[in-house]
Amino acid sequence: RVSFDKHSSELLPKDEKLIHYLAKHKHTSCFEHMGATLKLKVPIFIARQIQRHRTFSYNEISRRYVDSPPEFFWPDKWRKRAENAKQGSSDEEVVETMLRPASDDRWPVQRVADEYIKYVGSLYSDMLEEGIAPELARMILPQNMYTEMYMSGNLRAWSHFLHLRLDGHAQKEVQD
């Protein structure tokens, strides 16, 4: 209870009640003195959305120094584009999506994507085996590759982040 210049080494029920009151009524300055650091494993396209929150500090594992085999993210379903320009996708699934890769044959999008990822993963490995520096070889890796990072921030920033990113309007993959 800083406002009253009171200090305690234990958390009492009245302190818990005060914490809930302060959070509920958006009196958040007291939450800026405590922090948390999490290690996240997310696809690159999600990491870039997360890193737009400038109240956090980030450290990301670098493919410049780490050349372990990459892992890739796939959505549970391919969603349709939203009619509302404010949203990237709707909940409606695209069924039997077809692409025309390099020929007149039409292929299911998942098959094309799977083949592409196999090719890119193999090419990346071959480039490293040929002695190409990881900092150059990494440029061919796609946005759905997983990356790992540490994310640190105070509790007020975490509360704000979760409020925005768990909202139903946020991209599904961010919510997950």
List each model region and its residues.
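Family-specific signature for flavin-dependent thymidylate synthase
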Residues: 1-176
